[in-house]
């Protein structure tokens, strides 16, 4: 764990010493992004110590050939990965001929690095003594422009402190890069062309192209340009007296074939770099500050009295804002965002289950709708994916892992069996419409997805003569510490719900949008009468395991046959168990990776009374090791709902500081960005008690003991609501048309520009 290594501050991430053993972790935590590209917090100058260079362009992928021990029919041929792109931030430095390299300097006298989360600016300040005895102060400032999404900016200042010195700068772009996670150690890029100030590359197989150009400034410099394959470098040396800084400015244009013709890429990148140079560093920084202020305006959360909780939630929101802006339907939210290579930068069910509610409430319906359209645009691929596994008649199975709609995951127990992801796609449509009231989406796109998903479920079930019930065999639920089980409760429940919702939606479209209904029936060969009858018959006849004595739903058949070990009784040396135990031992244990039954009780909370939720929570949370980043948030929300605020707060801190404190000892691989949306849910739905019932936004707030107050904003049906909660009252300010709200069970109408106070 990080043990306080990252200092607590409400708006900044700060490390105040240089620890080479934490370099990889800090590269993840201090990563930057602007929604279309991003990168790890690598040092600009050469660093010969342990590092994972990482710069990524959203939407660009490489089909890395699948690597498995035993090929099974139906496996995907490749895993689509976001390739590590050119190292555009590079600025090598030498002082009186001695290279600056933190791994080899004589002494690091001081080191300070911060990310200013208000404006997504990374600053580093250090004093070092080089091997030749020269002591220098170094300050770097870096950001990816939110206002100009193809521009990266670096300021690099070196000041000799104990004598005059000659300082050599070599700003460069290096496109000769590899992915650490390449299955066969292949390079994903090949050179197209390299010129004095720019280089262009193409991804092998997938054919995406990108270009990087740099424009540089340094007072008194005469530049010498060096061009080698895939590398652009400019070098200049300047003399500075003791105490006088040499300041380099670097403006990088980063353009891809997603937005430009390949033949125009170098010209486009040069134009971006030149326009940045013309604007100048200070003006660009002002633009950045203003653009980020606008982003924060609708989504900041303020927590009174708890600095660690405050920093944690802002860090989570910040990473989400850096990762996705909703400007492009081709983009989505990878589990690591732009912070690392793990999971390939691709889309999982995390987007629908966790991220959509955050963007719904903070960015508005248009941005959230883009996430749904992303899946709609990939529906035909989902139908192809299902057909490869033997399903027919337009049944769709959305991939577990994807960039372009094709399945990329190559573990059979996940690819073939973790089919609950289909339910998450359907639930996201329901959640979007419930929150926005945008029923038109059903006719525009949603019904086609819903009926295709329902067709899959109708074919995936089996009739059990012994039970006289429909059963769901051979699945993996959200708890991935169980594979190939029968009758996973969550999978069966969301399957039944999906079929019912598809039938309900078909009726709505038929009655309200008859022309669209006819179009959909023809396009998808949909026979509503026959198909919905079958769906409802299955939903009404599904088997669900339960233990009446314990009063719980059974996670799957045979779960109570396992030795009932509690998570609290594990030896700390065995944690996390996925890094300590054999997979055989994990599968035979009762220990749970993340919410499974409880995921269903969270999604469908209105279907169950609090006593049912409480019994299941007490039983399953005690057996949960929370070794998925997606786990603590769901448990925190449910704990708050049943009134266990101490447990809710404990789990909230775990989810919100999962990466800052490195609970699972893996932040070096990248941050858990999609689960950060769950951290937001923990605050707003957990302690804020926000839910939507019958089209009405309701709040049932409860503050943990450590908090004095909680404030947040939500965009609900084009009204921006500011909610402030204290021990004794709730205050809601409305910016927009009058809106009906429910607070602690009492409904009230709030007019525009009105602040309503309610005692608790």
Where do the protein language model's features map onto the residues?
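Beta-sandwich/jelly-roll carbohydrate-recognition scaffolds of carbohydrate-active enzymes
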Residues: 2-311, 321
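C-terminal capping/lid segments that line or modulate ligand- or cofactor-binding pockets
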Residues: 24-57, 61, 354, 404-405, ...
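Non-catalytic C-terminal accessory modules of carbohydrate-active enzymes
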Residues: 77-131, 610-614, 621-622, 629, ...
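Structured secondary-structure scaffolds
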Residues: 295-370, 534-538, 545, 564, ...
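Structural helix-adjacent loops and short alpha-helical linkers that scaffold large soluble proteins
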Residues: 303-310, 326-328, 361-372, 433-448, ...
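Helix-terminus loop motifs that line ligand-binding clefts
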Residues: 324-339, 365-427, 433, 440-444, ...
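The feature captures the catalytic groove of carbohydrate-active enzymes
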Residues: 339-347, 396-435, 439-444, 455-534, ...
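Active-site core of glycosidic bond-cleaving carbohydrate-active enzymes
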Residues: 347-353, 357-376, 500, 507, ...
């Amino acid at each position: 764990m990080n043990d306080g290594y990252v200092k607590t501050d409400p708006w900044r991430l700060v490390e105040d010493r240089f620890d080479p053993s934490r370099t990889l972790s800090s590269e993840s935590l201090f990563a930057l992004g602007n929604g279309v590209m991003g990168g790890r917090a690598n040092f600009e100058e050469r660093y010969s110590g342990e590092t994972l260079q990482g710069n990524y362009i959203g939407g660009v992928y490489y089909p890395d050939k699948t690597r498995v021990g035993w090929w099974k029919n139906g496996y995907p041929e490749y895993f689509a990965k976001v390739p590590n792109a050119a190292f555009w931030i590079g600025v090598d430095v030498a002082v009186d001929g001695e290279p600056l390299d933190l791994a080899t300097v004589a002494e690091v006298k001081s080191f300070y690095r911060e990310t200013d989360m208000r404006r997504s600016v990374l600053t580093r300040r250090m004093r070092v003594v080089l091997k030749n005895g020269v002591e220098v102060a170094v300050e770097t400032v870096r950001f990816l422009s939110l206002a100009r999404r193809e521009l990266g900016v670096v300021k690099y200042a070196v000041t000799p402190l104990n004598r005059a010195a000659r300082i050599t700068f070599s700003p460069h772009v290096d496109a000769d890069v590899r992915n650490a996670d390449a299955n066969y150690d292949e390079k994903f890029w090949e050179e197209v062309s390299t010129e004095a100030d720019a280089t262009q590359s193409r991804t092998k197989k997938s054919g995406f192209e990108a270009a990087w150009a740099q424009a540089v400034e340094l007072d008194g410099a005469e530049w010498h340009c060096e061009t080698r394959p895939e590398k652009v470098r400019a070098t200049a040396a300047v003399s500075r007296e003791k105490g006088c800084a040499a300041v380099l400015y670097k403006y990088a244009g980063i353009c891809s074939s997603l937005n430009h013709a390949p033949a125009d890429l170098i010209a486009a990148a040069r134009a971006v770099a030149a326009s940045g140079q013309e604007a100048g560093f200070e003006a660009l920084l002002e633009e950045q500050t203003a653009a980020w202020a606008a982003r924060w305006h609708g989504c900041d959360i303020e927590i009174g009295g708890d600095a660690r909780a405050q920093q944690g939630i802002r860090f989570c929101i910040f990473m989400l804002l850096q990762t996705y802006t909703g400007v492009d339907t081709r983009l989505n939210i990878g589990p690591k965002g732009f912070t690392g290579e793990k999971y390939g930068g691709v889309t999982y069910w995390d987007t629908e289950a966790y991220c959509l509610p955050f963007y719904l409430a903070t960015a508005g319906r248009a941005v959230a709708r883009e996430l749904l359209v992303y899946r709609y645009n990939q529906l035909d691929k989902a139908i192809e994916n299902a057909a490869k596994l033997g399903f027919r008649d337009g049944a769709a199975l959305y991939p577990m892992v994807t960039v372009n709609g094709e399945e990329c995951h190559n573990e059979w127990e996940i690819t073939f069996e973790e089919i609950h992801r289909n339910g998450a796609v359907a639930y996201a449509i329901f959640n979007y419409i419930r929150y926005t009231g945008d029923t038109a989406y059903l006719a525009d796109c949603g019904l086609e997805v819903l009926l295709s998903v329902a067709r899959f479920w109708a074919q995936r079930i089996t009739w059990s003569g012994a039970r006289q019930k429909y059963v769901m065999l051979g699945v993996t639920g959200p708890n991935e510490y169980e594979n190939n089980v029968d009758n996973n409760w969550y999978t069966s429940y969301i399957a039944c719900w999906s079929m019912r919702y598809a039938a309900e939606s078909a009726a709505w479209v038929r009655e309200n949008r008859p022309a669209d209904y006819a179009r959909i029936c023809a396009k998808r060969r949909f026979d509503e009468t026959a198909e919905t009858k079958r769906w409802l018959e299955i939903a009404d006849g599904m088997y669900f395991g339960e233990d009446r004595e314990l009063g719980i739903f059974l996670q799957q058949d045979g779960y109570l046959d396992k030795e009932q070990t509690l998570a609290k009784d594990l030896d700390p040396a065995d944690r996390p168990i996925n890094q300590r135990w054999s997979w055989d031992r994990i599968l035979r244990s009762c220990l749970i990776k993340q919410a499974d039954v409880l995921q269903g009780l969270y999604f469908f909370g209105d279907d169950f009374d609090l006593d049912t939720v409480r019994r299941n929570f007490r039983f399953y949370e005690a057996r949960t090791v929370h070794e998925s980043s997606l786990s603590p948030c769901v448990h925190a929300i449910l704990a708050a709902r049943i009134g266990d605020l101490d447990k809710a707060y404990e789990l909230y801190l775990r989810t919100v500081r999962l990466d800052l404190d490195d609970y699972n000892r893996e932040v070096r691989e990248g941050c858990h960005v999609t689960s950060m949306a769950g951290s937001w849910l923990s605050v707003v739905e957990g302690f804020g008690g926000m839910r939507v019932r019958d089209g009405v936004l309701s709040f049932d707030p409860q503050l943990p003991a450590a908090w004095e107050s909680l404030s947040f904003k939500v965009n609900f049906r084009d009204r921006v609501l500011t909610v402030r909660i204290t021990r004794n009252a709730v205050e809601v300010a409305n910016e927009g048309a009058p809106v009906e709200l429910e607070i602690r069970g009492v409904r009230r109408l709030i007019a525009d520009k009105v602040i309503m106070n309610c005692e608790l």
